[in-house]
A protein has these predicted regions:
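Acidic/His-rich, divalent-metal-binding segments that scaffold phosphate/diphosphate chemistry
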Residues: 1-64
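Conserved active-site and cofactor/substrate-binding residues in soluble primary-metabolism enzymes
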Residues: 5, 9, 25-29, 67, ...
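Short polybasic/polar patches that bind polyanions
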Residues: 15, 39, 77, 145, ...
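A generic structural signal for well-ordered alpha-helical segments enriched in polar/charged residues
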Residues: 32-39, 74, 78, 182, ...
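Divalent metal-dependent catalytic cores for phosphoryl transfer on phosphate-bearing substrates
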Residues: 43-150, 159
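A structured, mid-to-C-terminal "fold-capping" secondary-structure block
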Residues: 138-194
């Protein structure tokens, strides 16, 4: 079992450098998605580690967007994170903003799911329910093909992420929708409490 800072300490570190509700909501979503994946893929004993990497993956993005994944090691070290967590967090920016390659399965999931949660979240907001609970893969695939929809979500990163995991794009979408369903209520409750 990997050692990890407490969730309270991780959340405090996130909020020290992130104030926009959108960024906090995204971090909480990726945290929940990563916890789901850890349990789903047989890494349940390391679920806290996976979730913490998800929570802190964009710790530097709001204040230092031009140094994304480059400023993070300093901030994470200050928060008490170890080298494994720092590597995991930075690896989600591989090929885009840094050269830290995702090697461990958790890092590959973070690389793929981070970008996909943005696309799924945007698609959910367009639904009458405003929820991922009734979203189907077929409707997400249509949004994925529409390059103008959620244009900031890189389809190349999502596709490359699926390939790195050895999954089809459809498998990645299906799993990530299920992961987002698992945490939607808790994320909404946390955001309402802010």
């Amino acid at each position: 079992m990997k050692e990890v800072i407490s969730r309270d300490a991780a959340l405090a570190a996130l909020k020290e450098y992130n104030h926009e509700p959108f960024h906090i909501q995204h971090a909480l979503t990726v945290e929940g998605v990563m916890r789901w994946y850890a349990n789903e893929l047989g890494y349940g004993e390391d679920a806290d580690f996976w979730a913490t990497a998800g929570l802190l993956h964009d710790i530097d993005f709001e204040m230092w967007p031009e140094q994304h994944c480059l400023k993070a090691p300093e901030l994470l070290e200050k928060a008490g994170c170890d080298a494994d967590l720092i590597h995991a967090v930075c690896s989600h920016g591989y090929g885009l903003v840094c050269g830290v390659e995702p090697v461990h399965e958790m890092e590959k999931v973070l690389f793929a799911a981070d970008e996909l949660t943005g696309l799924i979240g945007a698609a959910a907001r367009m639904r009458p329910s405003k929820s991922v609970m009734d979203m189907e893969v077929s409707s997400l695939k249509k949004k994925f093909k529409d390059k103008k929809f959620a244009a900031g979500c890189s389809r190349d990163v999502i596709t490359t992420g699926a390939e790195r995991l050895g999954w089809t794009l459809e498998e990645l979408m299906e799993k990530t929708i299920l992961a987002m369903r698992s945490c939607e209520d808790s994320v909404n409750a946390a955001m309402a409490a802010l």
